[in-house]
Every structure is written in structure tokens, then in C-alpha cells.
Amino acid sequence: MITHGCYTRTRHKHKLKKTLIMLSAGLGLFFYVNQNSFANGENYFKLGSDSKLLTHDSYQNRLFYTLKTGETVADLSKSQDINLSTIWSLNKHLYSSESEMMKAAPGQQIILPLKKLPFEYSALPLLGSAPLVAAGGVAGHTNKLTKMSPDVTKSNMTDDKALNYAAQQAASLGSQLQSRSLNGDYAKDTALGIAGNQASSQLQAWLQHYGTAEVNLQSGNNFDGSSLDFLLPFYDSEKMLAFGQVGARYIDSRFTANLGAGQRFFLPANMLGYNVFIDQDFSGDNTRLGIGGEYWRDYFKSSVNGYFRMSGWHESYNKKDYDERPANGFDIRFNGYLPSYPALGAKLIYEQYYGDNVALFNSDKLQSNPGAATVGVNYTPIPLVTMGIDYRHGTGNENDLLYSMQFRYQFDKSWSQQIEPQYVNELRTLSGSRYDLVQRNNNIILEYKKQDILSLNIPHDINGTEHSTQKIQLIVKSKYGLDRIVWDDSALRSQGGQIQHSGSQSAQDYQAILPAYVQGGSNIYKVTARAYDRNGNSSNNVQLTITVLSNGQVVDQVGVTDFTADKTSAKADNADTITYTATVKKNGVAQANVPVSFNIVSGTATLGANSAKTDANGKATVTLKSSTPGQVVVSAKTAEMTSALNASAVIFFDQTKASITEIKADKTTAVANGKDAIKYTVKVMKNGQPVNNQSVTFSTNFGMFNGKSQTQATTGNDGRATITLTSSSAGKATVSATVSDGAEVKATEVTFFDELKIDNKVDIIGNNVRGELPNIWLQYGQFKLKASGGDGTYSWYSENTSIATVDASGKVTLNGKGSVVIKATSGDKQTVSYTIKAPSYMIKVDKQAYYADAMSICKNLLPSTQTVLSDIYDSWGAANKYSHYSSMNSITAWIKQTSSEQRSGVSSTYNLITQNPLPGVNVNTPNVYAVCVE
């Protein structure tokens, strides 16, 4: 049968040439595997144009015979010596009763057993020749042998030669198709010519005699959605069918071929079968293995198929920036029909595929391990036409609705048998579907994987001293070029540090501004980065670890990074101990088995040991005790350290007296503005209990306690007394406290810094002019901001790098037109802002172009006069004084034409490096730049 179908799906581009080549290859295979059957020659001939052969499981040879005028079934029975009961057994499905068959009129068809008919010659016709006619056929039929090739008509012509000749004809057809470059109109004309050619119709008819041919031709969208399939038996007996199946299809702009083989075993009431297929996607270079099983009965079909990839990851044929490969999976299919109403059928399909990004529905909707169930109904009012509707529902509520109409033309049946409803029933029986195509998914379902088009790597962590600037080494691999890197440095910013762009033209040139070292803190910060390319793709997140060292530490040195006590005070009874812990690291990594020496810097006390080795965590401990009240400072040092690291002072106190056991400040720095205060708190204890209403005397060597250098405060119920210290000038202060005749204790030194400021005047890099920022800009022009106050170390930050970037020295680069805020943070955590206001205009140097092209590039926004550019030169100096233009010796720019210049074909120019204003320059002069005004 030949089946034509039409569907509602939209398809794309068709490669007709590949389809026809694949068809020729399939036919060549068919002739090869069937050469023994053809050589036998018993069943392959025709008896006139209206009598055709049909292979059958019960009667291997049947003849469809059209009654002539004056003929009856009884006449045939008598003249051909065929029993009437035999004829009736072959025609039960054509006539309602034997009596109706006997009344068959001229023009109606009767099926006769062909083995009863004598013949003298049988052979395979040549492509394009008229049908061969068997001698001694049915009365009234001509038995004339038509003209053939001389070799074929010779008396010694063998069946093998006939086979070889036919195979050569098929191969020749394929070769012709291969040698042509088929375009749209030519392909259509060629297809129509082949369809109308006698050789083609003979070829289709022969194939129909020995299997099933199904053609689905989509005429719209360049034939996308079209397919051809052939099931070709190469061994056929009543109980077993061995077959090959070839197919080709062009769906979703992919050309796919299928080649398979299988066996079907027929039992009295059912059929069991298996098959193996190789599926090849020639467009995308994907290969898949399919293994399937079948179980059929009358009015029922079921099959199960497994699909296994045979090709790996490679660049996708039609999905940009993705790799693809076949997805492994399976499906289970059921088809059923009502015996009482065989025109109505139903189907059920479940399919499951495996992979992270599988395109079960389409390549734009990728899913993980998707599955789908399909239910459908179809209606076949006559054998020629089948209409259906399928609904598929899958993972993630994806769904698909398909309407279809198929036209099935069977060459082995008369026209009347294809348009009358009573013949539908035969299609649903086991015998009638013996040569049906294997039910499977011939399209390769694909799995996709995003290509590594953009990757970011930071090979080294950063270790540096406080307030230092450290360059960040980045490794970026990008298919489309790096656009920007986005950082999350919130942890670093919380302590006064930051990640910032260096101000160069490279999008990956970043540096870390390290915060102050925090005594007793972790001083380890985690920041993350993500890269973006020019197409909007993003990389993976990458983490950078930054370790801040104190000023006394050296990078790559095995040294003490932390030295702390477990408590701030102890009883001066020579028994109560304070335990110190020293942490030893190298570049942020803990170091084991490192000797650490300990020493008493000030005060009177006794160490438990003078040295200790670090454990697996890089920690070494020592104890301290004393019998003398007072403060004690202890230090720790490794052999590689040039200076020791001091711990905070601890207090030993006489518990029998009211004694200060703790003194601390709430911060170590403050602004020297007379308002920013540092609060001190002392705690007074006696016999382990807080002392209430105890007078405490505070004194300072710098700053004031409410206008005084010495003052008193009284403790509360919790034994605590507080006081605040301010200063109107920068300097360092040490506060001490005493109670009655107790020992004096001192707090850690604090610092007052001048208020952080940014000067409103800027330094223009190109002309060394200091003044207000010009309100007309040169793109990539640079100026320097000057900060003062704070601790003297500053980190800079731009809130919008597309407008301006700023480097570690405060040098600003103007990238685009707009307003932006630049912030500076000092090491003592003061922050100040500088607002850059949008200019009245900015000029942008593009590329060299003729005047007309320059107008197009700038969208007609060229400088209106030479003055526009001379003002830029006066404000910013020569353009090549800036890093972006440093390699250029000349930037001659077009000026927008006046009306008179337009008539003359000339324009004016101005050079942004040498000035040199010129009038009357020909508009086709090369080496002149398009400089746009924004």
C-alpha cells in the first residue's frame, strides 16, 4: 500500500536529494536480499492490467480477476477447474453470501487461486516496461510478451540476469540523483516526473506485492514532515516472516534514515515478533540502536521498543551553544479496533527517556528524564481514508495535540475495494496486517548539554597585609568575549575592604582592597565572582578566599596570625591561670608542628612554658599566672617572624580588695570632630562579686572627658562604670583607670583621625589642569580624585562602572554618559561620596569611515562645528594622553556638513590630538574618524 498523510504540524526545510538517495539505497538492498525469491520466478508476473498478484499467508498466490462481459463465477469455476467452495473461501470478505458472489456482474472482481493457472514464462519486468503476461492465462486475456532488452528476451536469459539488470537500473537511478544538486523547483519537477514515470509505478507495484510501502508527503514548508518507509519480506512462509525495513524522513529540518530487520512468528490466533534497527540522523550525525518486540492479534496490536544511543556528545546541529546526543529510552504502544465496528480504533502510547536536558516535545523545552502518555482515536470510513486525533501529555504539563488525515492507496486492490466500507474489516485482521510496518518512534529523541562557552577560574587565593591592594588573577575562557564580572564582596565591604576594577580597558582586570586586620578575628573573607559574555551568557560562580595579615606579618611566612587569651583577668594568687592560644599559618593555611616562643612584654607574671609546638590545627598554647596585681602583656613569635605579636593586656587583681578586673573601649578609632566619642567601660569586683557605688578615676593622655583630661565615674549594681572620650584633633589616646588604692589599669590605645573628605576639584590627566570637572566629556577621558583624612589608606568604588570606573589611586575613567557616585572608604571605616553629574554632551570616537558611513554610524549626530571638538581639546587636552588612545598619533574627525558643503561634496575636520582644523575635505577621504556626539 502507498499511504499519503497530512498533519497540522508546521515543519521547516526539506532536503529532497538526500531522501531520494536514501530511497534508491533501500531499493538496492531490497533487490539484493530478495534475489533468491526472484530467481525462483514462480510468483512474480501479471495477467493483464486488471489482474494483480497478492501474497497471502494461507494462499501464497492469489489472482484478482475482473469478470468480462458474459462471464460468471460458475463459468470461471468450470473453465479453470476450480471448485466453487475454494473460490468462496477466498471471497468471503468481498461478498455477504455465496449466492451474492455467484451473482457477480461483469466488471466486479473475483479472487482466484493462482496455483491452478498454468504458465510458460515468468520474469521480473524491466523498469519502465509493460507488464509481462503469463501464457495460458484466464480465457479472454492476451498473453503477448512485450518488448524487452535484447539480453532479457534471449532464450537463454536466466532469472539471475533479470534480477541483476533490474538492480542495475535501480542503482543507475540512485547515481543520477546523487550527481545532481537539487534545488527547490528542480526537485519538485523531478519528483513529479518520477511519480508519473511508468518505471516508477511498476517499481511501487512490485514492492507492494512483497511488503508495505508508506509515504507521508508534506507539501508545505519545503516538505518538512515527509517520510518514506518500506517493509520488505525476504523470507515468507505460513508460520514465519523474516523482513527488512528501511525508511527515510525529513522532520524538524533533520534528515533521518532507519534500517532494520526482524522476524514475525504466526500462531493460530496471534503473532510474536522482534526487530532490530539502526537509526541515523545524517543532519546532526547522531546514531541510535533500537530493539523491539511485537505481539498482535486480530483487532489488536502491541509493541515495546528500547532505544540506545551509539554516538556521544558533539556540537548540536540546530541548537546554538549546545552539544547533543541521542537519549536512551523506551516506549510501549497499543492499538485496538472494535470487531463490531472495525472503522473505529484507539491507541495508547507511553514513552520515557533519560537525561538531564531531553527534548521530548521540542528543543526549546528541555526536561529531565521526561515521559509522556499519548491517547488517540482514529476513524477509517473506507480503506482509502483514515482520520485521527492524538493527545500527548508529558512531564511538566507539556502537551501536544495532533490532527491527522491519511490516504492509503493499495495497488493490489481495485478502486471499488478502497472506497467501500465493507473492506475496512480486512485491515484489522492478523492476516490483513501481516506486512504492516513496525510500530516504533523512527525519530531520534535528543539530549542536550550547554557548551562551556564561558568559564571563570581564580587559580590563587589572596594573602596580604591590611590596607594593601592585591591584584586578582583571573582566567576567563569565552566564546563570545568577556563583557563584565560581577562580584559579591559584601563580607569584605563590611570590614572596609572591597573588590574593584583597576580602571584599565580590560574587563577582567580587578584588584582587592584589603581591610584592617582585626585582632582576635578570623581575618579570612570569602568573595564570589560570576562572568558574563557579550551575548548575556553567564559562567559558574567562583569563590576567592582573602586572608588579611597584620602589618608585622609577611606573605609566604610561617607566622603567628592570632594570639588571644581565654579571659581578660585572673586572681593574683599564683594559682588562677590565663590560657593563651597562638595560631600559626602560612598564606592562610594552618601549619602543624611549628615551634612558637612566648615572652612577657610588660608586667609581673610567670609563663607555664617559654615555647610550644603547634598541633594539627596550627595552634600552640601556654598558661600565665601571677601573685602581683597589675596588667601583663605577653607576646608570641615563630622563627620566621621578624617581630613578635602581642596579645591584649590582661589584669591580675587582689580579690580581697575592690579591684578593676576589666577595661575596654567600644571601638579603636573615631573621627576627630569633637563629636564622635569612644566609650570606655570598667568593671570593679571584690571577692568575686560586683562592687556597687564605687568611685573610679579615669585619665587620658589625649582627648577630653567632657572637656577634662581626668574625671570620675561611679559603678552601678553590676559593678560597671562608663565614660566617653572625644577629640577635635587627630592623635592617639591611652585611657587609664584606678580605684582607691588599687593598681592602675590601661586600656588599649585608640586613634582619632581627621574627617574623611574628597576634594571637589579634580586633576585632569590630559592637560594637568586642576579644577572643576568639565561638563563636556571625552569618552575614556580620565581625571584623579584626591581624598584626605582618615587613616590615610583609601579604597575606591564606583556605583555604576558603565558610566565610570575608578582604580585604587582614585583615577576615574569615563565610559559612558550619565551620573554616577564614586565612594572612598578609609582604613578606619569612614566613607565619603563624590557625585559626578551627567555632562551636557560626550563625544565618542568610533572607527575610520567615509563621511556618509560616519553619518550612519553616528545616526547623524556628528559634531555640528569644529568648536564642539576644540572645546573638548581645551577641556581634556590631547586624546592620546589617555590610556585608551595612547597608541594613536592622529584622530581626525568629521564635522557635520553645512548646506553649501553638501552641494560641494566636502566637509570640515578637526584632529583631537593635533587640533589642525581643516575645511573643504572631500567626503570620500579615507582615514577620517566617525566621532559621535551623545
UniProtKB/Swiss-Prot annotation:
Has a signal sequence, a periplasmic Lys M domain, an inverse autotransporter domain (residues 210-411) predicted to form an outer membrane-embedded 12-stranded beta-barrel, followed by a linker domain (residues 412-449) also embedded in the outer membrane, and an extracellular passenger domain (residues 450-934) with a tightly-folded proteinase K (PK)-resistant, non-Big domain (residues 450-550), 3 Big domains and a C-type lectin domain. Residues 402-411 are annotated as: Signature sequence for beta-barrel assembly machinery (BAM), which recognizes the unfolded beta-barrel in the periplasm. This is Intimin. Gene3D superfamilies: 2.60.40.1080, Immunoglobulins, Inverse autotransporter, beta-domain, Mannose-Binding Protein A, subunit A. Homodimer. Interacts with Tir. InterPro entries: Big_1_dom, Big_2, C-type_lectin-like/link_sf, CTDL_fold, IAT_beta, IAT_beta_sf, Ig-like_fold, Intimin-Invasin_domain. 'Inverse' autotransporters have an N-terminal translocation domain followed by the passenger domain, as opposed to 'classical' autotransporters which have N-terminal passenger and C-terminal translocation domains. Residues 40-212 are annotated as: Required for periplasmic localization.
